[in-house]
């Protein structure tokens, strides 16, 4: 059966203060726990080496939304302004770099934290190559990537993620939080109450963050046939 994995790495994690990284790690762990609970254990993930994340998704159609949830979760965590420190500015803009892999899996062992197969090969290799490409750079071309055994589909989805990468790079903390909650399925009036702001403000930030494009991309991905 076709499954999906997400391999991810916090951008410029060494530039974060100890208390900032600790808080971010706790937010990511909470997100991973929620992911597992909502799927009754079918989906799961782990945070390792302090700044790396791996996620297994039983249903590959959930990968795009989950990746964007992880992206906006990290981006919404700290409400910084523009940073003079180059590495902290990279974190503010990008938050986390990630790669989605879709394919057959040979081994999925939650207890031993072991993943082996096509999906993790694609996501892991893409992320590793991007890390090498980004090393020493003060700017990044890509922080969201996609791979599967269908070259045409890979190119199509990868292009879509590249465009959303540009959109989300510009998103502020509050805009990222609104997109995050919309990805969870919450309505604007619910988000307004949650954030203690007015509904028109939610709508304005949502439009500024490119929500319509994000939603369209997610819905398109969720309709794909990965078994053919």
Feature locations, PLM:
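Regulatory and interdomain segments flanking nucleotide-handling catalytic cores
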Residues: 1-228
């Amino acid at each position: 059966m076709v499954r999906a994995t997400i391999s991810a790495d916090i951008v410029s994690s060494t530039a974060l203060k100890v208390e900032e990284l600790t808080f971010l790690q706790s937010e990511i762990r909470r997100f991973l726990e929620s992911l597992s609970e909502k799927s009754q254990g079918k989906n799961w993930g782990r945070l390792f080496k302090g700044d790396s994340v791996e996620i297994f998704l039983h249903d590959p159609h959930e990968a795009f939304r989950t990746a964007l949830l992880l992206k906006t979760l990290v981006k919404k965590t700290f409400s910084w302004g523009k940073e003079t420190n180059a590495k902290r500015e990279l974190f503010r803009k990008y938050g986390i770099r990630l790669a989605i892999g879709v394919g057959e899996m040979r081994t999925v062992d939650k207890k031993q934290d072991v993943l082996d197969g096509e999906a993790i090969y694609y996501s892991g290799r893409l992320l590793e190559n991007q890390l090498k490409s980004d090393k020493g750079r003060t700017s990044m071309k890509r922080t969201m990537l996609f791979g599967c055994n269908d070259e045409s589909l890979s190119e199509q989805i990868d292009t879509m993620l590249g465009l959303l990468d540009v959109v989300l790079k510009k998103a502020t903390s509050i805009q990222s939080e609104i997109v995050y909650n919309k990805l969870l399925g919450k309505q604007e009036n619910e988000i307004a109450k949650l954030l203690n702001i007015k509904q028109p403000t939610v709508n304005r930030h949502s439009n500024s963050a490119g929500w319509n494009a994000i939603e369209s991309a997610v819905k398109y991905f969720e309709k794909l046939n990965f078994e053919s």
